[in-house]
């Protein structure tokens, strides 16, 4: 017996390792066929039998009934294989009608529409004609010259009917050959000599210098090479014979009323046959040329409609004006073959029902209604009934089950015991959307679900439904139990934190239980054991909130039991009793008011130190305790719990006075409308916060009362602070003031809603708030779809990313440092490196002791050592630098977040990454409307304070002292660092240009000391020398305009866009500084003192005035701020992973150098960078209206922004390299999710980035056969170069390119996967011409061909099978 057979014999359908797609030759089509279809009839409407030679002909396609010929002469099995001599039908199973094909011999050749119209058109590219011209020939509009003969016509020239006639008259009938229709295209394709053509194109490529021409030649050359490699013949793109697909695949079914429903394909085939037959008759009867040509054109159109209806011209429609579904439509889209039937199948042994809560279940159980279980496990019950002799036959068993005899229930209990079932809730956004449970039989009709798994399923009990599936085989049951059991899915694969965390009521109950009040009965009493305390509690000597002392036994660090006396409450001790005993889990973790966060931390600790079983038991008991006390606490939501602070009116009056002042300033022309708007919005934001803070203070203070059982703490406050329900954002609106609202376009309405929900809104306020609320509702509806689409694209691009080996052996890695924003450490580096592996040996900076070996996993213990050593920058391995050729290695990936151990081989990390990024997207889309459109914008930052006592260090310090003796920052990239005593960076602040610096380099500062301040609403333009102002190129009405404010009547000078005037194009408005002699002052960098003014700048000085150093000569108002929410976020994530150019993108400097402004060109400004090493200077053309963030003479570093905005990802890759790009994308994506409080591990985003960086673009072909401009796989490129070097040839050069996820998915190695994703016809056309081979490596293509996916257990089966084949070969 061979080793292969040992691993299960591959069934007949499975004996292939790869799939190849080709263009079918006419001979091949005939070889598939079982006969020619010559009649358009389908079935006889009287006898309902198929017509002979028609589209359902039994002679061609096989018998309609099993083992029965059409005329009924031969019936039954004994006659199988006989062909009836009367009706010509072979006696066999009717199933062959699903497999046998027919064909139609076409009377005239017809072009295949995919090769003609699928862009780029293959036929026209090969013939080097435009698609329009080829169409004119095919659809009988123009003739084409094949052989110019003695005439001066060109080969391939098009002639109309008149031109042809004229040429014939001029040169004679036989002087040249011109023809029309598909025949001539077929002939032209036949005449192509690919070897010769390839040589000619290569030569032309070398000689041509035009980029456009090169691109065109490369395209054609690629196509020629594809044909040569695949051995397809180009004339096969024109068809002489048409295949007819089996009739059962295009069925005709009889409806109740004697009418028939038919597949559209039959109608399309009928048209083709009718036109074909008519054409045959016309040719035979030698009809006039014009009639024959018209019929040929109609045949071409009929075949086009069959293959791809609507692709060219008007779609063929049925009687109801609905277009017919063609063969292409059968494959395309969500309802097509790929996505509907191959990737998404309906399965047997499943059911669905409403879910209800099952608080008494254990974590691994679910309640299954008896009726449902009986139906789902029917076959198992039948076999057991028969086995035990309760029923004699299956039929008897069936009757017993239908009658629901008592014995049946006993058998059902036995069948169900330890047989896991899968529960799934749609939408399944991540792998925790399907989990396995052990069923418990229950009465009723609803499925009971354990409360703790609701978070993973995102389920609630307001009518949600769930589906049940039964794993049938032993292997499936085993996988369900080992991998999918709810108890094995405690951690979230997105961030490695527990997902089985108490929520809502449980949290509220535990919070209430762990409260400690002053002056309770029995305060300060001492107890030695719980029984004694319980006694005291029941006799009302203490309450659960009384502060007491207790002697507790616990394990110390050595693992010995010790007695400690602790201050605690009875409630906290009850939680403490549930803790597993472990020296690392100390009582202090729960000896406090437990909020949701604390509980999550404790569960995490228990999991890390005591393992899975202990965690499950702990979580279950915690849940029961929480529910019990949520019930007995009697916490409810009351009107009086919403407290309106007394100080509210004071704050509002103050703010209104402030706003009057702003209005006054605006009327006096001191500030622009935009600045006023920003200030007003800010003032109201601050007011709302103050009211909210006062309200919070009032709510948070315990109430004192002599009433028994009086609730001391505000119920609403408890709900919010514990994390059970609601947020302070919502409480603010209930009792404070609703605050500012947003318009539908995201702009903030200046008049806030002063009322809250308790007081009720006025009509006007209600109208204003409806606007923002409506936006929330609409957002939710629209975003859910786009989020689902993003997930789908992510899954598609990453689906073949699988862990394939332990270690790829690379030395590369990426450096990780803390994320600092506004001087605050938002994400410490320790959080980013947990669960990753070190890329180098890591030593203690002081003692030089080895902390981590290279390639060692950073776990919690190692992390503590790194933190205590004060290391902030760590080199870690990353999937981005992994050098595995297929897949990724375990060491580069690090910890599997769902288990907390090193990731195992076969894990489908790509899909997990895609789900982790996509799943929160859907949740976030639904976040906007919970706040009901209230604006959530913080006041603008206008200063920085020291967050620590530290020493100041200023990077790129360039300051001037102005007339008020203030230090003004003149540098564009000034940063202020706070260093501790060891010189470690504690905080980093970016100080904007024009800020007033209040400290200097080397100063010591104390906490909360102000370091710098600036105007947050405008960007100033500041002088660095004193002198006299001279306006240049400021022409009234063309480049500058006096803008008089409508409300105030105050004029101010504003720079305007001068495009519309011819002379305006040359103007470059600027201010120059003159010395006493009237000469232009020279600055310190040797350039003249001239300041270019962008469009929109408001002048602060008049022409001819004297100004001093550090004065503001103009202000550029910042755009008014809009609220940030995931609405901006989700499209931002999509923009990043699709690698799109942002709308107003930044321009980044490619080299270090000095900036100079060159001569403008039309509506563009010219920025020139002169590199330090005086090589070629680099020019950038930027639109005039854009805000340039550098001044003339500034020194810029490589990668600095020249123009504000989001940088283009491709630019970052080109200028700064892969690591900087990856860091940027990770940072930006994380920023979007962080805004919503969602945690995703960096490695998931890195996996996606790796998939986006799979391809390289050839820049120089060297000695290889690659073409410049061709895009190929990175590993493929390396292989080709290795071969070239081996053969002594010059290797090719290439640059890495970044592709968006859609593009990357469509260019994957597997054409099956790409075709099932998008643009099905284009992908298949391309693959057929190149004769592509799909090696079936990814998950998707294996699902489509119906195999186990090569991940998880399937990966090992695959590996074993391959090893077995190898062994067999060796043995032979």
Swiss-Prot record:
Binding site for Zn(2+) 1: 69, 71, 84, 87
Catalytic activity: RNA(n) + a ribonucleoside 5'-triphosphate = RNA(n+1) + diphosphate
Pfam family, one: RNA_pol_Rpb1_1
Cofactor, free-text remark: Binds 1 Mg(2+) ion per subunit. Binds 2 Zn(2+) ions per subunit.
GO cellular component terms, A-Z: DNA-directed RNA polymerase complex
SMART domains: RPOLA_N (SM00663)
A single GO BP: DNA-templated transcription
This protein's record includes keyword Lipid biosynthesis: no
Residues annotated to bind Zn(2+) 2: 808, 882, 889, 892
Gene3D superfamilies on file: 1.10.132.30, 1.10.150.390, 1.10.1790.20, 1.10.40.90, 2.40.40.20, 2.40.50.100, RNA polymerase II, clamp domain, RNA polymerase Rpb1, domain 3
Listed cofactors: Mg(2+); Zn(2+)
UniProt keyword terms in alphabetical order: DNA-directed RNA polymerase, Magnesium, Metal-binding, Nucleotidyltransferase, Transcription, Transferase, Zinc
Cited CDD domains: RNAP_beta'_C (cd02655), RNAP_beta'_N (cd01609)
Binding site residues for Mg(2+): 460, 462, 464
Stored PANTHER family: DNA-DIRECTED RNA POLYMERASE, DNA-DIRECTED RNA POLYMERASE SUBUNIT BETA
UniProt similarity note: Belongs to the RNA polymerase beta' chain family.
Protein name from the UniProt record: DNA-directed RNA polymerase subunit beta'
Organism: Rickettsia akari (strain Hartford)
Source lineage: Bacteria, Pseudomonadati, Pseudomonadota, Alphaproteobacteria, Rickettsiales
């Amino acid at each position: 017996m061979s080793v292969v057979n040992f691993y299960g014999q591959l069934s007949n359908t499975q004996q292939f390792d790869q799939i190849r797609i080709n263009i079918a030759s006419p001979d091949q089509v005939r070889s598939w066929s079982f006969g020619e279809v010559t009649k358009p009839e389908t079935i006889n409407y009287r006898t309902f039998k198929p017509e002979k030679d028609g589209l359902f002909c039994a002679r061609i396609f096989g018998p309609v009934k099993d083992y029965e010929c059409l005329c009924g002469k031969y019936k039954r099995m004994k006659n199988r294989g006989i062909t009836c001599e009367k009706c010509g039908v072979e006696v066999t199973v009717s199933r062959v009608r699903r497999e046998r094909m027919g064909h139609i011999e076409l009377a005239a050749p017809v072009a295949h529409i995919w090769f003609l119209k699928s862009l780029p058109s293959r036929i026209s590219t090969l013939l080097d004609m435009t698609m329009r011209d080829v169409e004119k020939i095919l659809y009988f509009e123009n003739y084409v010259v094949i052989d110019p003969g003695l005439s001066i016509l060109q080969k391939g020239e098009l002639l109309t009917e008149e031109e042809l006639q004229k040429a014939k008259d001029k040169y004679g009938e036989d002087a040249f050959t011109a023809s029309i229709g598909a025949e001539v295209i077929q002939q032209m394709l036949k005449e192509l000599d690919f070897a010769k053509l390839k040589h000619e194109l290569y030569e032309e490529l070398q000689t041509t210098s035009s980029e456009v021409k090169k691109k065109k030649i490369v395209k054609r050359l690629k196509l020629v090479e594809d044909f040569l490699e695949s051995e397809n013949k180009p004339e096969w793109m024109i068809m002489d014979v048409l295949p007819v697909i089996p009739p059962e695949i295009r069925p005709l079914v009889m409806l109740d009323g004697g009418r028939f429903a038919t597949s559209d394909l039959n109608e399309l085939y009928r048209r083709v046959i009718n036109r074909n037959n008519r054409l045959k008759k016309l040719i035979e009867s030698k009809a006039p040329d014009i009639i024959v040509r018209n019929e040929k054109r109609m045949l071409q159109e009929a075949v086009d409609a069959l293959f791809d209806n609507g692709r060219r011209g008007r779609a063929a429609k049925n009687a109801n004006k609905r277009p017919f579904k063609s063969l292409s439509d059968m494959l395309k889209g969500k309802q097509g073959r790929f996505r509907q039937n191959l990737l998404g199948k309906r399965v047997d042994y499943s059911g669905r029902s409403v879910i209800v809560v099952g608080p008494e279940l254990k974590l691994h159980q679910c309640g299954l209604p008896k009726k449902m279980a009986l139906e789902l496990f029917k076959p198992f019950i039948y076999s057991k009934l028969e086995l035990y002799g309760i029923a004699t036959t299956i039929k008897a068993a069936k009757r017993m089950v239908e009658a629901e005899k008592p014995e049946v229930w006993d058998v059902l209990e036995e069948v169900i015991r330890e047989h896991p079932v899968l529960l799934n809730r749609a939408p399944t956004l991540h792998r925790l959307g399907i989990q396995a449970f052990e069923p418990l039989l229950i009465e009723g009709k609803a499925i009971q679900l354990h409360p703790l798994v609701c978070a993973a399923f995102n389920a609630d009990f307001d009518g949600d439904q769930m589906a049940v599936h039964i794993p049938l085989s032993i292997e499936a049951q085993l996988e369900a139990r080992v991998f999918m059991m709810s108890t094995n899915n405690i951690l979230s694969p997105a961030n490695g934190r527990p997902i089985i965390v108490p929520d809502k009521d449980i949290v509220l109950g535990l919070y209430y239980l762990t409260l400690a009040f002053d002056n309770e009965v029995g305060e300060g009493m001492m107890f030695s054991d719980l029984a004694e305390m319980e006694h005291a509690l029941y006799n009302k000597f203490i309450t659960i909130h009384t502060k007491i002392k207790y002697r507790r036994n616990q394990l110390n660090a050595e693992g010995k039991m010790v007695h400690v006396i602790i201050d605690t409450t009875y409630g906290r001790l009850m939680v403490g009793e549930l803790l597993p005993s472990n020296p690392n889990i100390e009582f202090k973790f729960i000896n406090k008011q437990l909020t949701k966060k604390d509980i999550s931390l404790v569960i995490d600790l228990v999991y890390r130190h005591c393992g899975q079983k202990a965690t499950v038991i702990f979580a279950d008991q915690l849940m029961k305790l929480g529910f019990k006390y949520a019930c007995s606490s009697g916490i409810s939501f009351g009107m009086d719990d919403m407290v309106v602070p007394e100080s509210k009116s004071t704050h509002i009056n103050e703010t209104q006075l402030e706003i009057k002042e702003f209005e006054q300033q605006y009327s006096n022309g001191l500030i622009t409308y935009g600045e006023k708007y920003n200030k007003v919005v800010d003032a109201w934001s601050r007011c709302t916060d103050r009211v909210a803070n006062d309200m919070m203070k009032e709510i948070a203070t315990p109430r004192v009362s002599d009433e028994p059982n009086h609730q001391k703490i505000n119920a609403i406050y408890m709900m919010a602070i514990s994390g059970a329900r609601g947020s302070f954002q919502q409480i603010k609106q209930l009792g404070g003031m609703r605050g500012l609202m947003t318009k539908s376009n995201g702009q903030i309405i200046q008049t806030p809603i002063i009322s809250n929900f308790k007081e009720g809104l006025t009509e006007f306020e209600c109208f204003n708030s409806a606007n923002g609320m409506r936006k929330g509702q609409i957002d939710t509806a629209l975003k859910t779809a786009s989020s689902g689409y993003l997930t789908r694209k992510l899954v598609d691009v990453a689906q073949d990313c699988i862990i394939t080996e332990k270690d790829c052996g690379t030395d590369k890695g990426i450096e990780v440092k803390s994320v600092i924003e506004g001087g605050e450490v938002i994400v410490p580096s320790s959080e980013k490196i947990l669960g990753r592996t070190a890329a180098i040996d890591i030593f203690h900076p002081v003692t030089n002791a080895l902390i981590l070996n290279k390639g060692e996993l950073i776990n919690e213990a190692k992390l503590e050592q790194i933190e205590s050593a004060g290391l902030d920058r760590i080199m870690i391995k990353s999937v981005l630098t992994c050098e595995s050729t297929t897949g990724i290695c375990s060491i580069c990936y690090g910890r599997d977040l769902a288990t907390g151990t090193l990731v195992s081989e076969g894990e489908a990390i790509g899909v997990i990454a895609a789900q982790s990024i996509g799943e929160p997207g859907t949740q976030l889309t639904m976040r906007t409307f919970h706040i009901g459109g209230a604006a959530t914008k913080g006041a603008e930052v206008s200063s920085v304070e020291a967050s620590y006592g530290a020493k100041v260090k200023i990077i790129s310090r360039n300051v001037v002292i102005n007339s008020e003796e203030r230090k003004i920052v003149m540098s564009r990239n000034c940063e202020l660092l706070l260093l501790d005593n060891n010189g470690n960076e504690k905080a980093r602040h970016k100080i904007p240009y024009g800020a007033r610096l209040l400290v200097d380099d080397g100063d010591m500062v104390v906490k909360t000391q102000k370091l710098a301040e600036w105007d947050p609403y405008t960007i100033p333009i500041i002088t660095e020398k004193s002198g006299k102002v001279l306006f240049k190129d400021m022409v009234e009405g063309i480049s500058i305009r006096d803008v008089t404010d409508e409300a105030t009547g105050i004029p101010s000078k504003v720079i305007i866009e001068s495009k519309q005037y011819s002379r305006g194009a040359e103007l470059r408005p600027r201010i120059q500084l003159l010395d006493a002699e009237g000469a232009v002052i020279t600055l310190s960098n040797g350039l003249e003192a001239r300041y270019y003014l962008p469009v929109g700048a408001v002048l602060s000085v008049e022409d001819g005035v004297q100004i001093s150093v550090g004065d503001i000569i103009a202000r550029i108002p910042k755009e008014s701020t809009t609220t940030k929410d995931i609405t901006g976020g989700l499209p931002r994530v999509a923009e990043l992973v699709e690698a799109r150019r942002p709308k107003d993108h930044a321009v980044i400097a490619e080299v270090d150098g000095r900036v100079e402004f060159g001569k403008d060109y039309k509506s563009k400004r010219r920025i020139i960078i002169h590199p330090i090493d005086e090589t070629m200077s680099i020019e950038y053309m930027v639109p005039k209206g854009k805000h340039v963030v550098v001044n003339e003479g500034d020194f810029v570093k490589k990668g600095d922004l020249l123009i504000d905005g989001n940088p283009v990802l491709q630019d970052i890759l080109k200028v700064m390299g892969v690591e900087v790009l990856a860091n940027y994308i990770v940072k930006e994506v994380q920023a979007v999710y962080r805004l919503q409080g969602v945690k995703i591990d960096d490695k998931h985003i890195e996996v996606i980035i790796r998939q986006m960086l799979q391809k390289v673009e050839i820049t120089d072909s060297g000695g290889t056969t690659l073409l410049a401009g061709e895009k190929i796989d990175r590993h493929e490129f390396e292989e080709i170069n290795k071969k070239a070097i081996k053969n002594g040839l010059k290797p090719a050069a290439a640059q890495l390119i970044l592709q968006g996820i859609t593009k990357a998915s469509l260019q994957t190695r597997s054409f099956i996967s790409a075709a099932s994703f998008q643009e099905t016809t284009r992908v298949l056309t391309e693959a057929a011409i190149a004769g592509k081979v799909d090696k079936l490596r990814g998950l998707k293509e294996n699902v489509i061909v119906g195999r186990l996916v090569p991940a998880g257990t399937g990966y090992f089966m695959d590996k074993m099978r391959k090893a077995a084949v190898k062994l067999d070969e060796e043995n032979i």
